[in-house]
UniProtKB/Swiss-Prot annotation:
Presence of keyword Acyltransferase: no
A GO molecular function held by the record: phosphopyruvate hydratase activity
Keyword terms: Cytoplasm, Glycolysis, Isopeptide bond, Lyase, Magnesium, Metal-binding, Phosphoprotein, Ubl conjugation
Organism placement in taxonomy: Eukaryota, Fungi, Dikarya, Ascomycota, Saccharomycotina
Modified residue annotations for Phosphoserine: 138, 188
Source organism of the structure: Saccharomyces cerevisiae (strain ATCC 204508 / S288c) (Baker's yeast)
Cofactor(s) the protein requires to work: Mg(2+)
Active site: 160
Extra remark: Present with 2610 molecules/cell in log phase SD medium.
Compartments it resides in: Cytoplasm
PANTHER family: ENOLASE
Modified residues (Phosphothreonine): 313, 324
Entry protein name: Enolase 2
Enzyme class: lyase
Length: 437
């Protein structure tokens, strides 16, 4: 079915920063998508185009990307008369219009908006839910469909918070639930208990939440944070049903070849900085004491040696985010160096749906897991909820069970589970290999 109109506008994300919304019109209606935005902009990522005009939006405007959709992509896209059901053709067309390796001519935020809107239009044309269309595109098995374990970011440290705590995200994963709906209830109950305990121990303002909905108390060490979470799990009555995931974001505290766990202190003691081996030992001691099942970015993005050393003995899921930035060449290197065994998939890091699907397929082929992820600057768009079901990855990271831009995805997964009924299973303990269920 032909596309009669492509139109973009600037809207706002959950941090109050501009982002790109694209509308694509066919005979079936108007199909919309909003692009998320990350705080990180790694050198190996597709380029998120910002206007850099400091007199407006602190330089973060997206009018250039919006104009690229309206003045460059729109007319060419309509004229090309593409079949929106052929996502590869749509994305190849967008890539050829851009012509750069990192999408810097048109902007990954312009290209991705069109790519996602096209997928929504295609699902409508086929009269199927978006997740089913995405399963068709990725040639995923659909009997049964797999609902993911939500890795809920309930406590923040690192650059996302005050306090000395170096590690960035502490997540709870209700793997012991029987359904996604039960997982959400467990997650919600643990979250509320965590907020109460945090206020009790650190004062009322410690219950305030960060960009992704997690609490950010003035905590000094990882042990202190983990004790708080374990106490909240017990207080909620869900001991044994809830595991823990970490996102260390350790590129943030990598200095001169070592890791500074006191990086927020300008006077930090250099004699206490850790080598990669010493940091690995610290992770091992945490894994012995706490029910940790997944660690993301345990080392800096180019410290390959430390990644490979740790992976040999970790025995739990090791997720590559900064290491791979959803970039096929980086993923291939990580697979070859045996540095990790799971990919964090962020569609806007690579910039088209087809490339995102391929990144997941390459990872599955290497026996890796795939965790679909939001970004810190999110919107009400729920695309990744359908994507995680369509790709059958078994795990999603989309913030805390709080803040509407996070709940939008989690609520969409509740709807999908309800709609699928007995045609779906919850990944539970098998989150690492949802693709094999």
């Amino acid at each position: 079915m032909a596309v009669s109109k492509v139109y973009a506008r600037s809207v706002y994300d959950s941090r109050g920063n501009p982002t790109v919304e694209v509308e694509l019109t066919t005979e079936k209606g108007v199909f919309r998508s909003i692009v998320p935005s990350g705080a990180s902009t790694g050198v190996h990522e597709a380029l998120e185009m910002r206007d850099e005009d400091k007199s407006k939006w602190m330089g973060k405007g997206v009018m250039n990307a919006v104009n690229n959709v309206n003045n460059v992509i729109a007319a060419a896209f309509v004229k090309a008369n593409l079949d929106v059901k052929d996502q590869k053709a749509v994305d190849d067309f967008l890539l050829s219009l851009d012509g750069t390796a990192n999408k810097s001519k048109l902007g990954a935020n312009a290209i991705l908006g069109v790519s996602m809107a096209a997928a929504r239009a295609a699902a409508a044309e086929k009269n199927v839910p978006l997740y089913q269309h995405l399963a068709d595109l990725s040639k995923s098995k659909t009997s049964p469909y797999v609902l993911p374990v939500p890795f809920l970011n309930v406590l923040n440290g690192g650059s996302h918070a005050g306090g000395a705590l170096a590690l960035q995200e502490f997540m709870i994963a209700p793997t012991g639930a029987k359904t996604f709906a039960e997982a959400m209830r467990i997650g919600s109950e643990v979250y509320h208990n965590l907020k109460s305990l945090t206020k009790k121990r650190y004062g009322a303002s410690a219950g305030n939440v960060g960009d992704e909905g997690g609490v950010a108390p003035n905590i000094q060490t990882a042990e202190e944070a983990l004790d708080l979470i374990v106490d909240a799990i017990k207080a909620a009555g869900h001991d044994g049903k809830v595991k823990i995931g970490l996102d260390c974001a350790s590129s943030e505290f990598f200095k001169d070849g070592k890791y500074d766990l006191d990086f927020k202190n300008p006077e930090s003691d250099k004699s206490k900085w850790l080598t990669g081996v010493e940091l690995a030992d610290m992770y091992h001691s945490l894994m012995k004491r706490y029910p940790i099942v997944s660690i993301e970015d345990p080392f800096a993005e180019d410290d390959w040696e430390a990644w490979s050393h740790f992976f040999k003995t970790a025995g739990i899921q090791i997720v590559a985010d900064d290491l791979t930035v959803t970039n096929p060449a980086r993923i291939a290197t990580a697979i070859e160096k045996k540095a990790a065994d799971a990919l964090l998939l962020k569609v806007n890091q690579i910039g088209t749906l087809s490339e995102s699907i391929k990144a997941a397929q390459d990872s599955f082929a290497a026996n890796w897991g795939v965790m679909v992820s939001h970004r810190s600057g999110e919107t009400e768009d729920t695309f990744i909820a359908d994507l995680v079901v369509g790709l059958r990855t078994g795990q999603i990271k989309t913030g805390a069970p709080a803040r509407s831009e996070r709940l939008a995805k989690l609520n969409q997964l509740l709807r999908i589970e309800e709609e699928l009924g007995d045609k779906a299973v919850y990944a539970g303990e098998n989150f690492h290999h949802g693709d094999k269920l």
